[in-house]
């Protein structure tokens, strides 16, 4: 195998440890990395690194399958998913499996199948990981040159990038095919309170799809997170899948241009840093999506968004007080603004009170009551349906607030229930993970750039106190 750089440049940081725990070819002396530096020991051992990655995939898929079955075993069909702390079943339900009108679960068998399929897949991946980590060839370059690589071989690296892009594109098309041909997906906007339907009229107009990317991220704009109909979501996946596949073919067939060869650092640690940066961005976008978007993440499964719960409370009390004889169109609140209804700065009729800040919420239970200028007073007086009242009362008491072991919802709300919304879990976890991955990107990018510049030497360990201590064994 070709040696890439001098070993000193390739293993820039010196780490010492008790050498008797060594595995042949993967110890401190031969790799420059101690056992706790994990896969860094495998930088030049493509076969062993393959084993580590396949085993890691096995762990991920095992978690998915085991957690899936755990949620199925604990699932109570009479309660909404978001009251049961579920995070996987809502994803399956959103894809249209096992649910009917209104998001009611009518069959849990597809969820069981999903869990079992993931468990079986994880066993295959686990076996492959153990095989390649312990039994398979240490390097792939000699026996399987197609799967071998040298980190600084720019052409090979972009070929690998291309293969990954094609796989991502195929993944995007899996959702498209599910929505178009295999039973459809759950649409929270379906008339009468949501239902599973096949998507027939895809949005493929580039001005609409790419218009989302050009929107402001603030206020009522909301960038791509503001998408609120499934035609746009599935059409966006057609575009994304096509771009990924075409880009993948491009990267397989071409070599990097001179500017790219000069601008980028071409080492294993550099690629790691690029990947961490990308995953960090995905994490931050996912955080915003699950927190604000009630189309891709229907409130029937994930609970209401924060703005949705707030608007639901205003709506619930408007309904109550209107029944008690209040004139909701003219009643004045304590600040002199409308108590139930007021006008936004641009003239729309919106809910009054503290929830005015969420005036641009769109939700399936509320939209039928809007007219051309915001909320329609005559519809509010004559057209409110029982299902809208029930749903808003339910969402009012399930605000995605609250911390662990706290009463979910507004702390002063006597009807709130003790739960933590899956939106809180998923948004918080993805924000925190996105941040950690960003720090990992900075760390590995800094090391990769320093190694490429040739001045990273690591910490001088000659006078470390631990060197004078008795070995652990």
Curated annotation (Swiss-Prot):
GO CC annotation: what is one? chloroplast thylakoid membrane
* Cofactor binding notes: Binds multiple chlorophylls and provides some of the ligands for the Ca-4Mn-5O cluster of the oxygen-evolving complex. It may also provide a ligand for a Cl- that is required for oxygen evolution. PSII binds additional chlorophylls, carotenoids and specific lipids.
* GO BP annotations listed: photosynthetic electron transport in photosystem II
The protein's predominant localisation is: plastid
**Which compartments is it annotated to reside in?**
Plastid, Chloroplast thylakoid membrane
Give the binding site residues for [CaMn4O5] cluster: 367
Propeptide residue ranges?
1-14
Where does the chain cross the membrane? 69-93, 134-155, 178-200, 255-275, 291-312, 447-471
Which key words are in the record?
Answer: Acetylation, Chlorophyll, Chloroplast, Chromophore, Manganese, Membrane, Metal-binding, Phosphoprotein, Photosynthesis, Photosystem II, Plastid, Thylakoid, Transmembrane, Transmembrane helix
Q: Which GO molecular function annotation, any one, does this entry have? A: metal ion binding
What superkingdom does the record give? Eukaryota
Residues recorded with modification N-acetylthreonine = 15
Provide the membrane topology annotation.
Multi-pass membrane protein
Gene3D superfamilies, per database record:
photosystem ii from thermosynechococcus elongatus
The family database entries (HAMAP family) matched by this protein are listed as: PSII_PsbC_CP43
Q: What does this protein do?
A: One of the components of the core complex of photosystem II (PSII). It binds chlorophyll and helps catalyze the primary light-induced photochemical processes of PSII. PSII is a light-driven water:plastoquinone oxidoreductase, using light energy to abstract electrons from H(2)O, generating O(2) and a proton gradient subsequently used for ATP formation.
This protein's assembly is summarised as:
PSII is composed of 1 copy each of membrane proteins PsbA, PsbB, PsbC, PsbD, PsbE, PsbF, PsbH, PsbI, PsbJ, PsbK, PsbL, PsbM, PsbT, PsbX, PsbY, PsbZ, Psb30/Ycf12, at least 3 peripheral proteins of the oxygen-evolving complex and a large number of cofactors. It forms dimeric complexes.
This chain's protein is named Photosystem II CP43 reaction center protein
Species name for this entry?
Answer: Helianthus annuus (Common sunflower)
């Amino acid at each position: 195998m070709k040696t890439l750089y001098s070993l000193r440049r390739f293993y820039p940081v010196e780490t010492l440890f008790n050498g008797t725990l060594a595995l042949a070819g993967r110890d401190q002396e031969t790799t420059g990395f101690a056992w706790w530096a994990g896969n860094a020991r495998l930088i030049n051992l493509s076969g062993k690194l393959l084993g580590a990655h396949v085993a890691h995939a096995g762990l991920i898929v095992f978690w998915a399958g085991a957690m899936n079955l755990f949620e199925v075993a604990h699932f109570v069909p009479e309660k909404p998913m978001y009251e049961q702390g579920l995070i996987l079943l809502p994803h399956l339900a959103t894809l249209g499996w096992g649910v009917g009108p209104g998001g009611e679960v009518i069959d849990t068998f597809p969820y069981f199948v999903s869990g079992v399929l993931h468990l079986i897949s994880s066993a295959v991946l686990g076996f492959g990981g153990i095989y390649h980590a312990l039994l398979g060839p240490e390097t792939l370059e000699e026996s399987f040159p197609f799967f071998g690589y040298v980190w600084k071989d720019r052409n090979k690296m972009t070929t690998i990038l291309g293969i990954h892009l094609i796989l991502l594109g195929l993944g995007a098309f899996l959702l498209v095919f599910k929505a178009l041909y295999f039973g459809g997906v759950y649409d929270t906007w379906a008339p009468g309170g949501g239902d599973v339907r096949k998507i027939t009229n895809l949005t493929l107009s580039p001005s609409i799809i790419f218009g989302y990317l050009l929107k402001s991220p603030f206020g009522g704009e909301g960038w791509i997170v503001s998408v609120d109909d499934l035609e746009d979501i599935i059409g966006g996946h057609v575009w994304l899948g096509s771009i990924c596949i075409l880009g993948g073919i491009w990267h397989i067939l071409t070599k990097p241009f001179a500017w790219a060869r000069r601008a980028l650092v071409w080492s294993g640690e550099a690629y790691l840093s690029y990947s961490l940066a990308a995953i960090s961005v995905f994490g931050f976008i996912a955080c915003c999506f699950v927190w604000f978007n009630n189309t891709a993440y229907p409130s029937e499964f994930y609970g209401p968004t924060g703005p949705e719960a707030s608007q639901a409370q205003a709506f619930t009390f408007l309904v109550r007080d209107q029944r008690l004889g209040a004139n909701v169109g003219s009643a004045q609140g304590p600040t002199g603004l409308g108590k139930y209804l007021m006008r936004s700065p641009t003239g729309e009729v919106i809910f009054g009170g503290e929830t005015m800040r969420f005036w641009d919420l769109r939700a399936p239970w509320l939209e039928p009551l809007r007219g051309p200028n915001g909320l329609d007073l005559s519809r509010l007086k004559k057209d409110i349906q029982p299902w809208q009242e029930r749903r808003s009362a339910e969402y009012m008491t399930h605000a995605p607030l609250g911390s662990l072991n706290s009463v979910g919802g507004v702390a002063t709300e006597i009807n709130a229930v003790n739960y933590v919304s899956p939106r809180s879990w998923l948004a918080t976890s993805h924000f925190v993970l996105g941040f950690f991955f960003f720090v990992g990107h900075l760390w590995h990018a800094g090391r990769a750039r320093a190694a490429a510049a040739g001045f990273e030497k690591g910490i001088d360990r000659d006078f470390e106190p631990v060197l004078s201590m008795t070995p652990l064994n």
